[in-house]
């Protein structure tokens, strides 16, 4: 299986995060916990994985490890990185 982002078959994490940006902003505006914000982000990553994106497992591991350390600022920096990473 070719796992590059070719058309509509495999979706990039970036594409899904940006499509669901309002959901993420709403969570941030409500001041949700890091775990609750992560649930929204992980659902986006799971959507990418379901489309065949091989980088989704690694992204999930990265976000979950940041949550385990409780570093909100690092989490937001990583989230912005993923939202601008066209090929991830």
Language model features by range: what are they?
Residues 2-30:
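Short terminal alpha-helical segments
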Residues 85-88:
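Cysteine-centered motifs
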Residues 34, 39-69, 73-77:
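Acidic, low-complexity, intrinsically disordered interaction modules
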